[in-house]
């Protein structure tokens, strides 16, 4: 039960082990105890960690926005008979955000400390303060998803096979002729006995098997004669083709979904930007939904036009796509020396370069083409961003001059200025800094608000294209799966080794 002792202990004799709340190693005992009291009646946290919550909000769905900072719990909700990822605020003392675990949820780990998945409304990202807690959280969530998928696939395999045709018609047929014609009446007939059928002796000696052999073969029936009398179609009757139109093949099969090994490059780019995984492409129902969406939008040609239209936005591979991903917020320096920005919202695109001390506002306000020459590979240390983020603000008009002046160092990075440590973080490790953010509470939520809102304004046309529309379709699909699986989960979603407490 919530609020119980931390850790686990075995139950009484003959009873299964009683599950207990799992605390966070970064929180103090009284903070963990307060967190357990917020879980609710008969709710257990199977994994607890200190995180920042990032969301890719629907208007653009291309940029991460920091929403909350607190303790995330993987909750086993016995009254609802389901699992939830819930974020609690220790300062506010309440639930800040939650996402129910549905069957087709894909829990991805672009980095060991930043995990992403598709929520009911948008893409969500968890930035963990401790990688050990992140690893334990990921292992538990993926284990539950795998068990649920295996159980559903097992139910599909247990469906009864299609009924086979009955052999009633054969029972009324004649048995095969005896091997020895004209045999003795007392002789054992070979053919009928081999089939287990009752035999009747023929009393008329004139009727023998030789008479049956001499019968002529039956001639064609009148119906066959009528069919043979029909006029055959010759080549002269076949007209020339008309209305020919070349239609590109999308590579979708109703049974197996999309062929992920032979996908068109433009389709692969579209799916990657929309955050669609290979498991969703090979799922029959999900791939059918994606295929119908592509056909409604104009087929493969429309996808190619959309990709060509967005082609100039991302720069060449060296800058690692800094052009269309500049407003991404940086991450807090980890306890294991990690540095760099958050991964992009669309899964599959290479993560952006580390956070340098270049001028974030010019890179954000200007058009996407200017940032490409920037390498963005310098300044990987977390301390420089908060201190040097202010000076470069005056020179937004001349972004080109900085690159030639000092090579790779002051190059304007394609990263957002909304730095999380701006609220007074210590430059020392991310563990203490993130804990300070949690204890400060709501004040930190306001720091990225104004810059991030302005960052979402520049790319309206690209975000509302096929990529944004497809992401909305997949979000509706996840909500539909969530609602349809709710009844099934309540009916029989108990794991083999996990029983719900009533």
From Swiss-Prot:
Biological process according to GO: actin filament polymerization; actin filament-based movement; actin polymerization or depolymerization; blood coagulation; Cdc42 protein signal transduction; cellular response to type II interferon; defense response; endosomal transport
Bias (Acidic residues): 486-502
Protein species of origin: Homo sapiens (Human)
Gene3D superfamilies in alphabetical order: CRIB domain (3.90.810.10), Pleckstrin-homology domain (PH domain)/Phosphotyrosine-binding domain (PTB) (2.30.29.30)
Composition bias type Polar residues, residue spans: 201-211
Transmembrane segments: none
Stretches forming GRSGPLPPXP motif repeats: 337-346, 376-385
Modified residues (Phosphotyrosine): 291
Superkingdom per UniProt: Eukaryota
Effect in UniProt of substituting residue 270 to P: In XLN; a constitutively activating mutation
GO MF annotations in UniProt: actin binding; GTPase regulator activity; identical protein binding; phospholipase binding; protein kinase binding; SH3 domain binding; small GTPase binding
Domain notes: The WH1 (Wasp homology 1) domain may bind a Pro-rich ligand.
Region named Disordered: 146-240, 307-502
Stretches with biased composition (Pro residues): 341-419
Domain WH2: 430-447
Disease implicated: Wiskott-Aldrich syndrome: An X-linked recessive immunodeficiency characterized by eczema, thrombocytopenia, recurrent infections, and bloody diarrhea. Death usually occurs before age 10.
SUPFAM superfamilies named among the record's database cross-references: PH domain-like, Wiscott-Aldrich syndrome protein, WASP, C-terminal domain
Gene Ontology CC: one annotated term: plasma membrane
Record's protein name: Actin nucleation-promoting factor WAS
Domain CRIB: 238-251
Subunit structure: Binds the Arp2/3 complex. Interacts with CDC42, RAC, NCK, HCK, FYN, SRC kinase FGR, BTK, ABL1, PSTPIP1, WIP, and to the p85 subunit of PLC-gamma. Interacts (via C-terminus) with ALDOA. Interacts with NCK1 (via SH3 domains). Interacts with FCHSD2. (Microbial infection) Interacts with E.coli effector protein EspF(U).
């Amino acid at each position: 039960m919530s609020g119980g002792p931390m850790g686990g202990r075995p139950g009484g004799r003959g009873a299964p082990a009683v599950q207990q709340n799992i605390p966070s190693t970064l929180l103090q005992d009284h903070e963990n105890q307060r967190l357990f009291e917020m879980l609710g009646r008969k709710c257990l946290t199977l994994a607890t960690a200190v995180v920042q919550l990032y969301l890719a909000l629907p208007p653009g769905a291309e940029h991460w926005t920091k929403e909350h900072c607190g303790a995330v719990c993987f909750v086993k909700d016995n009254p609802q008979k389901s699992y939830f990822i819930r974020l609690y605020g220790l300062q506010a003392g309440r639930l800040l955000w939650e996402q129910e675990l549905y069957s087709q949820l894909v829990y991805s780990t672009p980095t060991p400390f930043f995990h992403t998945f598709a929520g009911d409304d948008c893409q969500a990202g968890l930035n963990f303060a401790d990688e050990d807690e992140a690893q334990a959280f990921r292992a538990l969530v993926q284990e539950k998803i795998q068990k649920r998928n295996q159980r559903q696939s097992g139910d599909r395999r247990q469906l009864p096979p299609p009924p086979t045709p009955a052999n009633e018609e054969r029972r009324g047929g004649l048995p095969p002729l005896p091997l020895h014609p004209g045999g003795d009446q007392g002789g054992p007939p070979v053919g009928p006995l081999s089939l287990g059928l009752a035999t009747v002796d023929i009393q008329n000696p004139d009727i023998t098997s030789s008479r049956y052999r001499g019968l002529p073969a039956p001639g064609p029936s009148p119906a066959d004669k009528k069919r043979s009398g029909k006029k055959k179609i010759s080549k002269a009757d076949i007209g020339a083709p008309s209305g020919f139109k070349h239609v590109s093949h999308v590579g979708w099969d109703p049974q197996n979904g999309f062929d992920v090994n032979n996908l068109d490059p433009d389709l692969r780019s579209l799916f990657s930007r929309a955050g669609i995984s290979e498991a969703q492409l090979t799922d029959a129902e999900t791939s059918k939904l994606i295929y119908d969406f592509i056909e409604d939008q104009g087929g493969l040609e429309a996808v190619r036009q959309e990709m060509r239209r967005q082609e100039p936005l991302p720069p060449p591979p060296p800058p690692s796509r800094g052009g269309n991903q500049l407003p991404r917020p940086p991450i807090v320096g980890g306890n294991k020396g990690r540095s760099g920005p958050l991964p992009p919202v669309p899964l599959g695109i290479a993560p952006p370069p580390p956070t340098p001390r270049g001028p974030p506002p010019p890179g954000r306000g200007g058009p996407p083409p200017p940032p490409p020459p920037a390498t963005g590979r310098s300044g990987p240390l977390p301390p420089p961003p908060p201190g040097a983020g202010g000076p470069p603000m005056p020179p937004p008009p001349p972004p080109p001059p900085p690159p030639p002046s000092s090579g790779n160092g002051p190059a304007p990075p394609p990263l957002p200025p909304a730095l999380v440590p701006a609220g007074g973080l210590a430059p020392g490790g991310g563990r203490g800094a993130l804990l300070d953010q949690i204890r400060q509470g709501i004040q930190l939520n306001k720091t990225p608000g104004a810059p991030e809102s302005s960052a979402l304004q520049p790319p309206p046309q690209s975000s509302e294209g096929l990529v944004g529309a497809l992401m909305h379709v997949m979000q509706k699909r996840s909500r539909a799966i969530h609602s349809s699986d709710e009844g099934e989960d309540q009916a029989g979603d108990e794991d083999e080794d996990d029983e719900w407490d009533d």
